[in-house]
Regions:
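Lumenal/extracellular ectodomains and adaptor appendage modules
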Residues: 1-177
Length: 177
């Protein structure tokens, strides 16, 4: 996913919770840029949730720490290069690799903060899913999402860099098994 926002710090975290209590704790942390809940008795949070890429304005941001805490699994990023960008709008790119039970038949992505411009890609080529589709719900002036799909491979949702969307917006990917 990628979007634009004003950053307030040169360090931030991406978190993965195993229950609602942990997720609530991650939501309360102002340094948590993205959070996810990973449910399933056979899943191991450190193994089944991976941050593949974290970039700001096209630059890779290094992992400075990754650990399991009372809030779940936390992956911390930071760089001295980000200090001049504090209180400025930047383009954030996050790529996550995670497992999701096919039987749930949905994959929701929610926005908790005002966001300008957006790109969300859902790759399912190796997941053996059928009839994959996206339902978006964007709060804003007149946000019009462009949806493109590669049958059997991926769906991409994009909003122009000129469009703002507001909290409680998002997209739900739905499929048949």
């Amino acid at each position: 996913m990628e979007y634009k926002k004003t950053i307030r710090s040169d360090t931030f975290m991406i978190g993965c919770a195993s229950d609602r209590e942990q997720l609530d704790a991650l939501i309360e942390d102002e340094h948590c840029e993205y959070r996810w809940i990973l449910g399933g008795s056979d899943l191991v949070i450190e193994r089944d949730f991976t941050v593949e890429k974290m970039r700001i304005d096209g630059e890779d941001i290094p992992i400075i720490d990754a650990k399991k805490t009372h809030r779940g699994y936390e992956v911390w990023f930071g760089s001295e290069k980000l200090k001049p960008k504090i209180n400025r709008e930047v383009k954030i790119e996050i790529e996550i690799l995670t497992k999701k039970a096919k039987g749930n038949r949905t994959f929701p992505v929610y926005l908790l903060y005002p966001t300008r411009g957006l790109e969300i890609k859902f790759h399912y080529e190796n997941a053996n899913l059928r009839n994959v589709r996206a339902e978006s719900f964007f709060a804003g002036r007149h946000p019009q999402a462009a949806v493109s799909s590669k049958r059997g491979k991926s769906i991409e949702i994009q909003l122009s860099n000129e469009e703002w969307v507001f909290p409680t917006s998002g997209v739900i990917f739905i499929w048949d098994v």
